[in-house]
Amino acid sequence: MTVVGEAYLPLGDRDFTATVQRILDSGADCVLNTVNGTSNLGLFTALAAAKVDPAKLPVFSTSIAEDELRSLVPEQVRGHYALSCYFQSLATSANRRWIAGFRDEFGFDRVTGDPMEPDWCLVHLWKQAVEKAGSFETEAVRQAFRDGLSYAGPGGTVRLDPKTQHTTKFFRIGRIRGDRQFDIVHASEAPLDPDPYPQIAFPGWSVDWTTDGITRGPEVTIDGDV
């Protein structure tokens, strides 16, 4: 895989006309979209205006979930993709029960999504640690974390890694549907281990909360067009 270009725009920017033209001129086969928040509306509006066909130039977004799709135009995003650990359309009994309970509490029109599901799991992992420690004190709870707790969540069973204090996660790719939901087109066979400081991005950095915590390497800089 070759990266043929990259661009960084201010958070909240809505004008992506020039950026989309650069994408088209680059000859890219796909787009990795790390845009956040309302800027996604500007990006997909510009893509639609340029008549970008997701079958020929798909966009893979890292921060679009079901709730974000409620504010986007279905015709502009249908056929593009999201990279995520959880989708509401996951067809498991645990997920269906969770969605039903969520809708009973907040209404049938509300949706679940990836930003929400790990929070649910983490609260339950913290609860396990508190019960195991028999205390709310921070150090006692951290000590309980060292036993490698796990929780069967809506997106699958996750395990807390004592060294990083991050959890294992499934990886999934979803294709956006016209009803603002996702068809899951790929899923990892097993949960992936956490890697909060990948060496390609954080050379020399590491973390081990069972010993010395975070080991810092060189300060990270971003090279690219602004």
Each language-model region and where it sits:
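Extracytosolic ligand-binding ectodomains
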Residues: 1-226
